[in-house]
Structures are given as C-alpha cells and as structure tokens.
A protein has these predicted regions:
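Conserved GNAT-fold acetyl-CoA-binding loop/helix
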Residues: 15-43
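Conserved active-site alpha-helix within GNAT-family acetyltransferase domains
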Residues: 92-96, 115-133, 138-139
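A short beta-loop-alpha structural element at the N-terminal edge
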Residues: 1-15
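Conserved GNAT acetyl-CoA-binding A-motif
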Residues: 102-113
C-alpha cells in the first residue's frame, strides 16, 4: 500500500534510505554520497512539507519517494526500496504514485541517478523518462539527468 508519509515514519524511512543507498555507495566506491548523509530532521522536513510517500508491507515501511514541486516542475528524489523487497514492483509503484499525485500540477518530472546505476536507469527509462544530459560530479561519478512529461487523461 502506498500513501502519504507521516512524521512517525521518519525513522523507518531513513533506515530504508540508508540500506538502499549503501549499494549505490559501493557502486561508486564512495561512502559519503549525499543520501547517506541525510538526517532524521531532513526526512521529517520532507514529510512535513508533504513531499514524501511511503510503501508499506503491513505496518513495515518498505519504500519511499519524494516529489518536490517548484513551479511547473516536480523533482523526483530519494526513491528507495528496502533491499530485501526489491524486484517486486515497489519502486515502479512509488514512481507511478508520485507522478499521479503531481501530474495535474506540473509540466514535467525530472530526476537523476548515477551513471553506473543500471537498475535505476532501467526503471526510469521503462517508465518513460528520457535522458537529457550527464553531469560529471567526481572522477568516478556522473549523474544522468532524465525527464518526463505527464500523461494527461
């Protein structure tokens, strides 16, 4: 089940986020990637701002995503799934949920992921996102930026 996050979910969201991003950090041999430095206060702030959705398996938080609207653009961020729950369509469902929530308010969705993150790129491209540009961040990390125009009913 996917729905809005509540402040009481912050600790679980942060735990899932850290678990999910450890594999990303390993891909880039960098334990200091930004999502691993997020704090409980950062997660709470996103929740209070109405940006966060969670996926639950019973009472357990198994995934989360943020949708940050600025003008006519929604930036999709921190899409995470608990490592033991991957491959079950949770990431796709979270992405679809944030898009459905914001589709009437925005002209496009944007997001980025690391260039070595093949699973993430497959998910985003499969959901209709197209590459727009690549930004080199370090010698081992480039960010692939993607965007999508909402489907209007």
């Amino acid at each position: 089940m996917i729905g809005p996050a509540s402040p009481r979910d912050a600790g679980e969201i942060l735990t899932v986020q850290h678990a999910a991003y450890v594999t990303e950090a390993q891909l880039y041999d960098d334990p200091h990637i930004v999502p691993l430095n997020d704090t409980l206060d950062d997660v709470r702030a996103a929740i209070v701002a109405g940006q966060a959705l969670v996926a639950r398996d019973g009472s357990r938080v198994v995934g989360a995503v943020r949708g940050v609207v600025d003008g006519d653009v929604c930036t999709v961020a921190r899409l995470v799934v608990a490592p033991d729950m991957r491959g079950r369509g949770i990431g796709s469902a979270l992405l679809a949920a944030v898009e459905a929530r914001e589709a009437g308010r925005v002209e496009r969705f944007v997001l980025f992921t690391g260039h070595r993150s093949a699973g993430n790129l497959r998910l985003y491209r499969g959901a209709g996102y197209v590459d727009t540009h690549v930004v080199a961040v370090t010698g081992t990390l480039s960010l692939v930026h993607l965007e999508k125009t909402p489907v209007r009913g």
